[in-house]
Structures are given as structure tokens and as C-alpha cells.
């Protein structure tokens, strides 16, 4: 009731349900997978009325032996002993620069410090077996991320997110 009537909701749950037979969720983590993020970005583009590239415009990359947050939460060795592949997609044919500003957050989720802006990759490469692979996109949550691409279409987007939103921005570079 407080949003402008021009703000359009994007129902990602129905879209994810249509792809439930695919690997849209990570088995060892509490997040959806990069493929789930792809379908969410696709639905966002449909609702926004903007073009969207299919997966053939992305390079498929894999970090093998990923064990996500569910092991950290549960300490259940059956999760640790059954790692999965963390499959993600990097846009082809588009150049981009990513600038970050890190923030320090206390236990009450209050910002207690701000770092200086720095340039780093958008897609971080993790070694096989590394438990941090979910941070492949943007390297985590406690930072402001600005991406400038070689796509000149006059559009801009701002994403306010928690960790579930990490999978979305990499599909919006075109």
C-alpha cells in the first residue's frame, strides 16, 4: 500500500515451481542455485518488459565438491560426505567493471564502518571443494556493488537484496 502503483511485483515462486524438476536449489545449501537465479531474472525481465538473453549467451562454469551452509548449520556428516557441483553462468560478449564498497556490520545488523571503494571481479573463482562458492557472485553480502557494462541501452537497475539475491544480478548485464 506504500508503493507507487507503477511498481510491479515479480512472483519468483511460481516461476521456480515450474522448474522444480531442474537443479534450481542447492542440495547442501539453504539458497537457490544460479540456475534458479537465472529463471528469476528471466521473470523480472518479462515483468519489466525488457529483452533477456537465454543461457546460450553465458559460459557455464563449475566448482566441484561444494558443501554449502546446511553442513555448517547441522554438522551432519552425511551432507559433508555428499558434496555437489556449484554450477554458475558468466555472460559472454559483454565487458563489465565492478566497484565495491565494503561495510562492517555488528551483531545487531547496524553499519559500524565503511571502507574505500575498490575494483574487483564480479565473479570470484573458488577452488574445487571450497565452501564459499555461494559467494562467487559479488563475494558476499556486506557491500555496495556497482556494475558498469559495455551494454548501452539506457537502462539502470538497483537491487536491494539479502543473500538470496546474489544469483540475480549476473543475468542482467545485457
What are these regions (language model features)?
Residues 1-174:
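Extracellular glycan-modifying ectodomains
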Amino acid at each position: 500500500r506504500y508503493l507507487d502503483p507503477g511498481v510491479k511485483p515479480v512472483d519468483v515462486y511460481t516461476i521456480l515451481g515450474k522448474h522444480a524438476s531442474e537443479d534450481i536449489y542447492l542440495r547442501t545449501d539453504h539458497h537457490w542455485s544460479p540456475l534458479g537465479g537465472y529463471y528469476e531474472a528471466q521473470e523480472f525481465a518479462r515483468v519489466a518488459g525488457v529483452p533477456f538473453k537465454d543461457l546460450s549467451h553465458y559460459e557455464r562454469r563449475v566448482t566441484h565438491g561444494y558443501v554449502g551452509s546446511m553442513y555448517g548449520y547441522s554438522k551432519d556428516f552425511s551432507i559433508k560426505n555428499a558434496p555437489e557441483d556449484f554450477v554458475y553462468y558468466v555472460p559472454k560478449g559483454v565487458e563489465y567493471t565492478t566497484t565495491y564498497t565494503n561495510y562492517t556490520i555488528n551483531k545487531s545488523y547496524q553499519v559500524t564502518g565503511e571502507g574505500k571503494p575498490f575494483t574487483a571481479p564480479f565473479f570470484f573463482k573458488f577452488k574445487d571443494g571450497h565452501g564459499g562458492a555461494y559467494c562467487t557472485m559479488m563475494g558476499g553480502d556486506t557491500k555496495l556493488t556497482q556494475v558498469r557494462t559495455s551494454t548501452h541501452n539506457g537502462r539502470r537497475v538497483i537491487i536491494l537484496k539479502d543473500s538470496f539475491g546474489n544469483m540475480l544480478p549476473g543475468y542482467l548485464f545485457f
